[in-house]
Curated annotation (Swiss-Prot):
EC number of this enzyme: 1.1.1.22
Active site positions, chain numbering: C274
Modification Phosphoserine, positions: S395
Residues holding substrate: 159-163, 218-225, 258-271, 336-337, 449
Name of the molecule in the record: UDP-glucose 6-dehydrogenase 2
Catalytic activity: UDP-alpha-D-glucose + 2 NAD(+) + H2O = UDP-alpha-D-glucuronate + 2 NADH + 3 H(+)
SMART domains reported for this sequence: UDPG_MGDP_dh_C
Chain residues that bind NAD(+): 8-13, 33, 38, 86-90, 127-128, 163, 274-277, 344
Organism encoding this protein: Oryza sativa subsp. japonica (Rice)
NCBIfam families: NDP-sugDHase
Role summary: Involved in the biosynthesis of UDP-glucuronic acid (UDP-GlcA), providing nucleotide sugars for cell-wall polymers.
Length: 482
């Protein structure tokens, strides 16, 4: 029986290996992680991550040919194919801090592989890494191998999953990308991994390239997607200034077959573990290769995203008589997108910090985010979310300004304003009349995801702001915001 081991039981490693186990019942798949609580979660009825459809896949395979373990060394030693799906966060200090990828976890994984391997291995980069990482990993493996004349083949097999649809993306991917060395051994390794995916992925969707093309393709894909979001968000600011409707503009340009409609929804900004991190990594790589114009081009995608978040906060404050001090603001949604509990780099963090910084009292509701997670996120510094550190509790002054509710109506009770920051479907179905009746007047609603009908809410009595939509008379009369 072929044995696959995956180092890293997070948002990528867990779902990916579960689907491989489901589609390849004759392959033994073991997911390993040094975090005992995380592995306990994968072995329990309540998985450590929320992803639609994941529970069912794990339930079918776990204990049959899918296993989760903290015994990293044993399972790495036994496997013929080792996926590495560890975090590659942005560096917080030292050379490249604030841009470069921190490969500490990747290097640690490579050293474990070298230390315990007693047979040839195919090592698969599943994490997003800088171009030429495979070359560095080859050197680490070659100089640290304890098992004699062991041969390693490094492959790049980046993930292209979207949280909230990860299982669907794995079942029916747009493409599977496999990059390897252009040698007989490298081509054989590519063929071996391709044979795994070929169990359920059509041949024309499995793309093979050289290593460097595969590594760069992942960074480029995320940069292009984030670029579309920042582009439509930039247009949303112009729409508000001119009276145009960003939804109509996006629909119009999306009908152009050369552009297409996806990733053209204006919002308070993009978040998640990948977009910002990968673009900053791309910026750093461009700078290292002496391409400052290219670096500046991609850095502007991040700058527009930051601008969109600060613009939203400024709109809230300026609309409410230029002060939110002591006013309750209900925040609906804290995850970076619907159908996930992931809060990494969520725009809600910056919005909530901005409101609290102006002395607002913030009441947060999200159906998949715990109070512990909210408080943890709001005390973190930028780029800290994937770095181990001793977290300090929220300061007493900040804590009294932040509360977490498990009900949208309770969050809005007694509030002066509601901010919608995640596009959860349930927010489209709320009884906004009931919510309005329990709020201070004038009652404001700031829709950062364009999930509600602004005209309907205005008829109820709300003062409504929707990203990129024509401003109502109240907002037009308020001072302009940057």
């Amino acid at each position: 029986m072929v044995k696959i081991c995956c180092i890293g039981a997070g948002y990528v490693g867990g779902p990916t290996m579960a689907v491989i186990a489901l589609k390849c019942p004759d392959v033994e798949v073991v997911v390993v992680d040094i975090s005992a609580p995380r592995i306990e979660g994968w072995n329990s009825e309540r998985l450590p991550i929320y992803e639609p459809g994941l529970d069912d896949v794990v339930r079918q395979c776990r204990g049959r040919n899918l296993f989760f373990s903290t015994d990293v060394e044993r399972h790495v030693a036994d496997a013929g194919i080792v996926f590495v799906s560890v975090n590659t966060p942005t560096k917080t200090r030292g050379l490249g801090a604030g841009k470069a990828a921190d490969l500490t976890y990747w290097e640690s994984a490579a050293r474990i592989i070298a230390d315990v391997s007693r047979s040839d291995k195919i090592v698969v980069e599943k994490s997003t890494v800088p171009v030429k990482t495979a070359e560095a990993i080859e050197k680490i493996l070659a100089h640290n191998s304890k098992g004699g004349n062991i041969r390693y083949q490094i492959l790049s097999n980046p993930e292209f999953l979207a949280e909230g649809t990860a299982i669907q993306d794995l079942f029916s991917p747009d493409r599977v990308l496999i990059g390897g060395r252009e040698t007989p051994e490298g081509r054989a390794a590519v063929a071996a991994l391709k044979s795994i995916y070929a169990r359920w992925v059509p041949d024309d969707r499995i793309i093979t390239t050289n290593l460097w093309s595969a590594e760069l393709s992942k960074l480029a894909a995320n940069a292009f997607l984030a670029q579309r979001i920042s582009s439509v968000n930039a247009i949303s600011a112009l729409c508000e200034a001119t009276g145009a409707d960003v939804t109509e503009v996006a629909n119009s340009i999306g009908k152009d077959s050369r552009i297409g409609p996806r990733f053209l929804s204006a919002s308070v900004g993009f978040g998640g573990s990948c977009f910002q991190k990968d673009i900053l990594n791309l910026v750093y790589i461009c700078e290292c290769y002496g391409l400052p114009e290219v670096a500046n081009y991609w850095h502007q995608v991040i700058r527009i995203n930051d601008y969109q978040k600060s613009r939203f906060v400024n709109r809230v404050v300026s609309s409410m008589f230029n002060t939110v001090a002591g006013k309750k603001v209900a925040v609906l949604g804290f995850a970076f997108k619907k159908d996930t509990g992931d809060t990494r780099e969520t725009p809600a963090i910056d919005v909530c910090k901005g409101l609290v910084g102006d002395k607002a009292v913030v009441s947060i509701y999200d159906p998949q985010v715990t109070e512990e997670q909210v408080q943890r996120d709001l005390v973190m510094n930028k780029f800290d979310w994937d770095h181990p550190r001793h977290l300090q509790p929220m300061s007493p002054s900040s804590a009294k300004h932040v509360a977490v509710s498990w009900d949208a109506y309770e969050a809005a009770r007694g509030a002066h304003a509601v901010c919608i920051l995640t596009e959860w479907d349930e927010f489209r179905r709320l009884d906004y009349q009931r919510m309005y009746d329990a709020m201070h007047k004038p009652a404001f609603l700031f829709d950062g995801r364009n999930v509600v009908d602004p005209d309907k809410l205005r008829r109820i009595g709300f003062v409504v702001y929707s990203i990129g939509k024509p401003l109502d008379h109240w907002l037009r009369d308020m001072p302009a915001v940057a």
